[in-house]
């Protein structure tokens, strides 16, 4: 299941169940088209969309795929292809890393996400 690829080993079981249940509730015909289209949009438009941004941008990064295509948590100072793309095309972005969570930090670490957003907004 594709959504399971967004989780890491340390993702709490209730979060894992919620993510999988939500993905399974999506009609198969929609899900089969959705992921390839999202990936294609990113490949075709992400760099230009990032470069066109003229507003403050907060990016919260938590995971990446390792060489074995397994999603793993990242640590502050780690470099990923996505972070390199952000630095190249949106050098004004504020990049924050939340460790030890999967692709859904708003579910796994809501207090940490909220603090980062509050601090970002306070600096505007």
Regions found by a protein language model. Name each.
Residues 25, 54-57, 119:
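Short, intrinsically disordered/low-complexity patches at protein termini
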Residues 1-50:
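Conserved alpha/beta-hydrolase catalytic His-Asp/Glu region
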Residues 88-124:
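Catalytic active-site module of serine/aspartate enzymes centered on a nucleophile-bearing elbow/loop
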Residues 43, 72, 115-119:
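Residue-level signature of transmembrane alpha-helix interfaces in integral membrane proteins
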Residues 54-101:
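Conserved loop-alpha-helix segment in the C-terminal half of the alpha/beta-hydrolase fold
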Residues 36, 48-51, 84, 118, ...:
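Surface-exposed alpha-helical segments enriched in charged/polar residues
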Residues 45-49, 61-64, 112, 121:
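Alpha-helix boundary/capping detector
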Residues 42, 68, 78-79, 111, ...:
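Acidic-enriched, low-complexity/disordered segments with a strong bias for Aspartate over Glutamate
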